[in-house]
Structure formats: C-alpha cells, structure tokens
C-alpha cells in the first residue's frame, strides 16, 4: 500500500507560478506543522528536494508539476478540472526522480488549493481555530497517510459563504486597536485566515466607523483579500463597493460627490461616488451590493413618502448602478456577481402592496442575487415561492447571530441556538436559497461555535443538513473534540459537551440582554429552580474542567468554553436569585437578605469573568467582552438605561414571625391570630404526585420555634418540629393507598407561642387511566405536540418532531 510519513523532515515543493495567496497559506500550514512536530518543514523552490518525501501543491492551469504528473499517469485530474473550489488530496508513489512519495494537493482554482492545504492541517489534528483562539494541536512525531486518505472534495453546497463584521464597537474595534493599531490589513489577515480555515470565502467588512478600502492603509486590505481568494462585498446598505462611512469623509460643497446622500437632490454626485468605487475595486473579486438606503442605515425616504415614491426611486437607482457596472467592469452583467438585500423596509418595496407593483420581476434585478433576511432574531422572514425560484441570479440569506437594533439588541456572548440555525438554514436551502449565505457575526469573539456550524453547513449541506436537528448534538460533540481532545480526558470532554449544549439551550429561551427577574417565576412550576440547578451545574463543570486544563491551553479554553459558559450561567443565576430575592423580601423572609448578597456576588462575578477573558493569554482577546449585556429595559432595544438587578433587603420583625409556603407557590401563611384562612394544596390530585415540598421560613430577628400537628393518618412529614433562623425545607408524603375517593387532610404548623397556620391537602386515591388520557391539574391540561393521536405524511411533506427545538 502506498503511504507517506508526514513529519518535520518533509519538504514543501513550491512553484514560482503558484498563486501568491496559495504560497501564503502554505506558510500558514508549515507553521501548523511546526506546532505539531516541533520544527517547520523546509521549502524547496527548485526541482531537487533534499527529502524523499514531499508535499506538492498547486492549482490546475498554474502548475507544470501537476501537468507532468497527469501526463505520466500518476494523477487523474478530470474530477477536479473546471470545478468550483474543489481539490484532489492524494498520496503518490515515486512522483519524480529522487522522491519516494508525495502528498499531492491539486486545486481546481485558488480557493480549492487553499482548502486542500488547510485540510492537511486538519488531518494532522490542527483546529481551524489554531491561531484565532490559540488552540494548540497535540504534539506528534509523525502522521502516516495512505492511499485510503486520497479523495476528491465536493463542490461546496452554497457558492458564497461568509460573515459580516458588524456593530464592531466597543468589542472588535478595541481588540483590533490593541493588537493591530486599527482595523487594517494586518487585522484582516487574521480574519481572512479564520474565514478560509472555516471553509468560507466571502466577507462583509466592518463598517460602523471603518473604511475597508481606506484603512489598509489604502487598498492593502482589499489587495490582501484578493491575494488570498476572499471575495469581498459590502453590507446591505453600502452600494457599489463603497463603505457607509466613506461618503462622510468625501462629501462637501466643492466635492465631486456633492454634499447630500440623496439620489433625488444629488443624483450626479452620488453617481460619481458609486462610479469611482466600482473603478477603484474592479480588479478584485467582488460581489457588488445594489440598491440604496438612507445615511447611517436608515430609510431612504422620509416617513411621508409613499410606497410608489420609494419603489420608483429604487428603480432609478438600480438602472443607474447597472449602467455604471457595464461602463466600468463588464458590459455583460451576467458575469458580474451582484446582490440586493431585502432587509428592513426594502423587503416591502420588493413585494409592493395592493396599490403599487413592487420590484419583484423588475428587469433591472435580472441576474441579481436576491438576499432574503431573518427577523433580526434568527427566524427567516420569507422564502422563495415555487414561482420565484427560477429567478436568474438565485437567492441568498442574511442571517443574524448578532444584532444592534430592534426588537432587542444582543451583542455579547454568542447566543445562536444551533438547532434553530439548522432548522432555518436547511429550510432556506431546500427552498432554493443556495447562492449566498452571510451571517452578521458582530465582533467574531465568542461566536466561534455558531459560526463554525453555519459555515460547515453551508460548505456541506449533505453532511450536516441531516434529517433533523439532532445532528447539531453530533456536531457539538465533534466541534468540542476538535478543539480540546488533545488536552482533556474523555470523561471531562463528555461533561463539557453537555455543558456547551445546555448553555446554548439556555440562550434559546432568553438571551443575556433581555433576561430579567420576571422571565422565570421564582416558584411557579419550579421553573426558576430548574434553571438555577442548570446554572450551578454549568459553573461546576466549567470550573472542574479549568482545573484540569493545561496552562498552555488556557487561552483557547477560556475563550471558547469557560467564558461563554460561565458568563452565561452566572448572568442567568443572578436574575433567578434577583427574582427570588424580590419575592422573599415581599414576604419578609430573612433569607431574602442572603439572596441580595448572592445577587451582588453575581454582579461582581460578571465583571470578573470579563476581566479574566480579557487578561488570559496576555490579553489575546481583550475587547471581545466589552459589550453591554445586562438589564436592557422594555422601553429600549439597546443598552440605554440598562441596569443590574435591584436588591431588596427585608428588615426583621420584632417578634418571631413564621412564613409557611409551598415550594412552588407564592401564597403563604404567617400563622397570625387574625383573619387567616387555610391554604389549600391540590397537587396530590395528580396521579403522579405523592409528595409536596414546603418551607417554614423566619421573618424576624428572633428564631421561630415550630411544631407540626395532624390527625390525618395518610399524611407523613419528613420533620415535625424544630427551630428556624432562615428557612426549613420539609416534605409531606401522601399515602394514597389509604384513600377512598377524594379526601381532604388537614395539618397545622404552630409558631410556638405566636399562632398557627392551617393547611388543607386535597388528594385522590390512585386510579388507572387508559393510555393517551390527559388529566386536569388545577384547571389546566398539558398536551405536548408529540402527543398526537394520528399523523399522516404526504409524499415528501409531513410533520417531524424536533426535540431539540422545544423549550423544555
């Protein structure tokens, strides 16, 4: 069997004719191999390598060595030639004189070769996040590849796959300033490398206060993108390769671009601005954004403008832009990738209304990829109808993993729930959205988990599309082991996988910014208790794993796991405790004061987790944790007037005060002498309930001495007397075998010397019910969606239960 030993002695055969970007990526891979083997492999630029084993890489049409190997019958390149972003990965015996074996990486084009080179790194155990998150690979002496490792890659499922760096201040911008003195070409080299390692190829650059084509300095960032094969675009409101902030730098009364961002009053100036942008970037590989919005990502016309006004203006804009592209880039518009993003009010202008025909079927949009969008919260707004799917230019999706805007901003720790992402994007693909996928990734930092899945899904929908969302659990397990299999035992990795999933699921219910003390009721249905238990488990798992983490992997561990998990769990815990503090203070429980102190501890911990994230690895991730994330108010979508939870302290009563309450009910008794009616607990009317947990709490400076009395033979208590300074937890057990029909049992909790609380428990003897029978509980009946009596699928259409998408 043909094989090759990959180690530090292997040589890279480099051809002068190779793409410069491919050579640069080969350098990245050599650096990866140094991390694996301890020494960087040498480069041979001639025809006489010193080693008998070599890595021969090249692009079909730009490599004489590949031509020679094909002519000699050593390679079969027909499965690669002419394809999009495809590579051959093959072990070849005796490829040239003096060489025993070679690993050949042959790309159909520049990006195909680059993906093939990075695939080699992955085969050696190198994570795509090796440089972005400092994920160190396991050290090895060698890796053996055989002819069984040879294969030809598939064409990517989605043509353009990428992300949008958006809302970049204070997080990404601060990080870039610290490490690169700005969002410049040096900064973008790190971003481009990450994008390509994740098998993406398309980028919308940062644009809040950044100018991709000016801050390189100059065009250096654009030139580097083109060198590396990264296709550049601009966001939904930045037409003709112009950054949104550029116009503000160039406008003026004496400017050729005029002094008004208005196609109505300054058509010539805006046209000149677009023309010069197209000319400046025409030598690079771009996808050109079409259309127009108002300044700073606002509506193009005022509130008084009609649908007809807006649609007619956009028709003029599109006609002008297409003409400019013909004049400056290519007369054949079909050869120029273009998009129009149907986002915010532009979506309405596309579809029109009952009075005004929209831009649907507009001739100027022929050949333009129509970018649909989600609702800013991860749910696709529209998908192409069957009649729309033949649109020349195809469809794309603009998806938010970060949002600075309504209905509520979320910009801190990555909060995209993988099963929802899977559901939305696989549905989009099935409806023909296959040309472009781009996600608003915000600051990149802490989004790596969700971003990895988004781009892997776009690259190979066949592998990760699957039949249902359960495949996202498999992905989570694989992703975590890609990062940490080299440094943790399987038992710890299993707990980390569960924790990563649970943290992600918590955020599917409520994101950080909009969590508050009202979301989960402090006692109803034990929902707050369940969340609190989950948070404590997450914190314990993360801290246990940190103790086992090698010091050289702490940067990767903290950035990819510890900070997202602990930051999220601590925040959720803080709000749960705040809700409980508020309720208990209202009841005057002394435990409320302890809870107030615990809330304060969580507030301090929140700051400590961010500080730890920023300081780890000599500040490698400094800035990524800066976004505001706590207590966004209902009246604002953003962080204006946001606040940490309020803490309430209870002042102790003068005399011993007792509070008796069921654990899942806010109603309580104090046992006072006047006007108190008994509490009635009906939990035991349920077939599956034979125990009720309740609490005896102290609401005074003096301790409460209590006694429990009952004449009911079927009520049994875990404890019947004691002294309480804070809270006593007691369980009453109902022996249903003694019941005959429905009965009511009474018991009394005595605050010795100060009163008595009376409790009634309603219970019913055990009954047998037929399968599929639903029981009332306190006036409610619960039926899960999976409790259907019949389900009939028709052809390829039907209902599929997705357990991962439930809230429970």
Short names for language-model regions:
Residues 1-154:
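Contiguous, structured surface segment used for ligand recognition
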Residues 699-731:
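Surface-exposed binding patches on compact interaction domains or structured appendages
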């Amino acid at each position: 069997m043909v094989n090759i030993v990959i180690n530090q002695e292997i040589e890279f055969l480099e051809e002068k004719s190779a793409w410069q970007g491919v050579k640069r990526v080969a350098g990245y891979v050599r650096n990866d191999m140094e991390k694996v083997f301890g020494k960087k492999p040498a480069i041979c630029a001639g025809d006489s390598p010193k080693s008998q084993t070599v890595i021969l890489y090249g692009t079909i049409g730009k490599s004489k060595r590949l031509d020679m190997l094909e002519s000699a019958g050593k390679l079969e390149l027909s499965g690669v030639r002419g394809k999009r972003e495809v590579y051959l990965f093959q072990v070849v015996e005796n490829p040239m004189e003096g060489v025993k074996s070679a690993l050949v990486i042959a790309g159909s084009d520049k990006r195909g070769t680059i993906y093939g080179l990075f695939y080699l790194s992955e085969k050696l155990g190198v994570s795509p996040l090796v440089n972005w998150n400092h994920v160190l690979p396991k050290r090895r002496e060698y890796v053996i590849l055989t002819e069984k490792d040879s294969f030809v890659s598939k064409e990517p499922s989605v043509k353009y796959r990428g992300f949008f760096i958006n809302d970049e201040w204070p997080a990404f911008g601060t990080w870039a300033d610290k490490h690169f003195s700005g969002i410049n070409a040096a900064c973008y080299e790190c971003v481009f490398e990450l994008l390509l390692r994740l098998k993406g190829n398309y980028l919308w650059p940062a644009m809040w206060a950044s100018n991709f084509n000016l801050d390189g300095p100059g065009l250096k960032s654009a030139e580097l993108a083109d060198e590396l094969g990264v296709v550049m675009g601009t966001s939904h409101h930045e037409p003709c390769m112009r950054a949104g902030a550029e116009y503000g730098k160039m406008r003026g009364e004496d400017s050729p671009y005029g002094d008004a961002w208005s196609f109505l009053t300054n058509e010539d100036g805006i046209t000149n601005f677009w023309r010069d942008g197209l000319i400046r970037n025409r030598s690079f590989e771009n996808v050109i954004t079409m259309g127009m919005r108002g300044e700073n990502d606002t509506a193009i016309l005022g509130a008084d403008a009609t649908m007809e006004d807006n649609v007619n203006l956009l028709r003029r804009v599109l006609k002008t832009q297409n003409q400019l592209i013909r004049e400056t880039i290519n007369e054949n518009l079909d050869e120029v990738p273009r998009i129009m993003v149907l986002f915010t009010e532009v979506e309405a202008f596309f579809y029109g209304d009952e009075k005004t025909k929209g831009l649907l079927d507009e001739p100027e949009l022929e050949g333009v990829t129509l970018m649909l969008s989600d609702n800013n919260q991860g749910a696709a707004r529209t998908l192409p109808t069957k009649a729309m799917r033949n649109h020349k230019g195809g469809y794309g999706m603009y998806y938010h993993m970060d949002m600075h805007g309504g209905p509520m901003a979320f910009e801190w720790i990555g909060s995209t729930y993988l099963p929802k992402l899977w559901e939305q994007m696989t549905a989009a693909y099935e409806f023909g959205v296959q040309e472009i996928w781009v996600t608003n990734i915000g600051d990149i930092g802490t989004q790596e988990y969700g971003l990895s899945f988004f781009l892997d899904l776009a690259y190979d929908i066949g592998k990760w599309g699957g039949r249902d969302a359960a495949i996202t659990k498999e992905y989570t397990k694989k992703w975590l082991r890609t990062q940490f299999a080299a440094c943790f035992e399987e038992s710890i990795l299993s707990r980390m996988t569960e924790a990563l999933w649970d943290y992600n699921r918590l955020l599917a219910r409520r994101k950080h910014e909009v969590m508050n003390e009202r979301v989960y009721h402090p006692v109803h249905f034990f929902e707050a208790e369940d969340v609190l238990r989950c948070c404590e488990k997450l914190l314990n798992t993360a801290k246990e794993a940190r103790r086992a983490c090698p010091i050289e992997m702490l940067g990767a561990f903290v950035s990819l796991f510890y900070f997202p998990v602990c930051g999220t769990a601590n925040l959720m815990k803080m709000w749960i405790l705040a809700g409980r503090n508020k309720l208990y203070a209202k009841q005057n429980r002394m435990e409320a004061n302890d809870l107030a102190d615990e809330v304060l501890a969580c507030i301090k911990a929140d700051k400590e987790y961010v500080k730890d994230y920023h300081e780890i690895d000599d500040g490698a991730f400094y800035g990524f944790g800066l976004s505001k994330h706590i207590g966004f108010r209902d009246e604002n979508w953003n962080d204006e007037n946001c606040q940490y939870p309020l803490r309430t302290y209870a002042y102790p009563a003068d005399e011993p005060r007792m509070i008796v309450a069921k654990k899942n009910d806010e109603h309580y008794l104090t046992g006072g002498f006047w006007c108190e009616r008994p509490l009635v607990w009906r939990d035991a009317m349920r077939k599956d309930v034979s125990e009720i947990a309740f609490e005896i709490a102290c609401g005074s400076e003096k301790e409460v001495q209590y006694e429990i009395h009952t004449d009911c033979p079927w009520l049994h208590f875990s404890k019947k007397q004691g002294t309480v300074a804070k809270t006593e937890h007691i369980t009453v057990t109902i022996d249903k075998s003694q019941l005959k029909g429905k009965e009511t049992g009474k018991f009394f909790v005595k605050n010795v010397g100060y009163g008595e609380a009376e409790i009634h428990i309603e219970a019913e003897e055990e009954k047998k019910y037929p399968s599929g029978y639903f029981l009332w509980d306190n006036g409610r009946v619960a039926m899960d969606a999976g409790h259907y009596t019949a389900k009939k699928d028709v052809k390829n259409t039907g209902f599929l239960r997705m357990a991962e998408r439930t809230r429970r």
